[in-house]
């Protein structure tokens, strides 16, 4: 049975393949130029003439545009700096932290300045109060020293007034009457703290060793036997030679009393002086008694 597929002319698809005008295009044949096309350029590829082209566009990096992002004419390097000089892109949290930190530092600096100014004011007030207190203490000390000096001079006058009469009593008055309290090392008890004597003697490096008083005894003995001139008693008055023997007896009694005082004081030269003064008085009484 015959079908449409059996006949070569039954369908348009069965027409010859070369009948299409598009398929019959020959690449070697020159292409027809349209009437409105530009003439071909005689310049080869990558050739730029000295004269500018009337149809060309100006360069982006030229002076015809005021582009702030354009590179300068004489710059041949990269537009961006090197990567090691470019900072890392900071995030929002880091920028916010830097802002808060700057605010905190500013507040802290402000507080420090206020505190410093307050300290300076307090120091000025303290110095002013210290100077005033110092002046008051100096004036008080001057008054106290004047009173103490007056008392000391009065005591010295009193001491020298009676020192020539009983100088051993004067020496005993020079020694303080307070009993020295020996303070031991270590912890103090409450009872010891309550007692506050006038003189406190702290034990030396050798506890239990008695104080050497030999030098003090030597000085006292030297003062006893050879007293200084201001502590020597005045010489007794000379016995008045009278016609009656009463004056002679009185002179002998005065000489005997002086010798007794001298012996009581313990001064050997004074005893000799008293004996020498009593001898003429006794010699003067003997002729009167014989007569």
From Swiss-Prot:
Keywords (A to Z) from UniProt: Coated pit, Coiled coil, Cytoplasmic vesicle, Membrane
Region feature Involved in binding clathrin heavy chain, mapped onto this chain: 84-146
GO molecular function, a single term: clathrin heavy chain binding
Pfam (any one): Clathrin_lg_ch
Renumbered residue ranges of the record's region Disordered: 1-91, 183-291
Ranges of Pro residues composition bias in the record: 31-43, 228-238
Disulfide cross-links: none
Low complexity compositional bias, start-end: 253-267, 274-291
InterPro entries the UniProt entry points to: Clathrin_L-chain
UniProt function note: Clathrin is the major protein of the polyhedral coat of coated pits and vesicles.
Protein family per UniProt: Belongs to the clathrin light chain family.
Subunit structure: Clathrin coats are formed from molecules containing 3 heavy chains and 3 light chains.
PANTHER family to which the protein is assigned, alphabetical: CLATHRIN LIGHT CHAIN
Protein name according to UniProt: Clathrin light chain 2
Species this protein is from: Oryza sativa subsp. japonica
Lineage of source species: Eukaryota, Viridiplantae, Streptophyta, Embryophyta, Tracheophyta
């Amino acid at each position: 049975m015959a079908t449409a597929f059996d006949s070569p002319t039954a369908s348009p698809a069965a027409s010859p393949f070369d009948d299409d005008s598009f398929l019959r295009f020959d690449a070697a044949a020159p292409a027809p130029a349209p009437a409105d096309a530009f003439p071909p350029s005689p310049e080869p590829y990558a050739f730029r003439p000295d004269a500018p082209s009337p149809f060309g566009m100006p360069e982006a990096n030229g002076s015809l545009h005021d582009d702030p992002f354009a590179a300068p004419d004489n710059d041949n390097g990269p537009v961006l700096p090197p990567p090691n000089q470019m900072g890392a892109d900071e995030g929002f949290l880091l920028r916010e932290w830097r802002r808060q930190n700057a605010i905190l530092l500013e507040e802290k600096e402000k507080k420090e300045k206020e505190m410093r100014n307050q300290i300076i004011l307090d120091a000025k007030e303290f110095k002013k109060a210290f100077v005033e207190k110092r002046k008051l203490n100096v004036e008080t000390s001057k008054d106290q020293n004047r009173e103490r000096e007056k008392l000391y001079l009065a005591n010295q006058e009193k001491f020298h007034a009676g020192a020539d009469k009983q100088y051993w009593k004067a020496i005993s008055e020079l020694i303080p009457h307070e009993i020295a309290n020996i303070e031991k090392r270590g912890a103090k008890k409450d009872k010891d703290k309550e007692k506050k004597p006038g003189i406190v003697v702290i034990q030396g490096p050798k506890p239990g060793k008695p104080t050497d008083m030999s030098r003090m005894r030597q000085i006292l003995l030297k003062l006893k036997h050879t007293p200084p001139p201001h502590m020597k008693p005045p010489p007794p008055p000379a016995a008045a030679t009278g016609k009656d023997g009463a004056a002679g007896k009185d002179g002998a009694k005065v000489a005997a009393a002086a010798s007794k005082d001298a012996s009581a004081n313990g001064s050997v030269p004074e005893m000799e002086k008293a004996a020498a003064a009593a001898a003429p008085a006794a010699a003067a009484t003997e002729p009167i008694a014989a007569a």
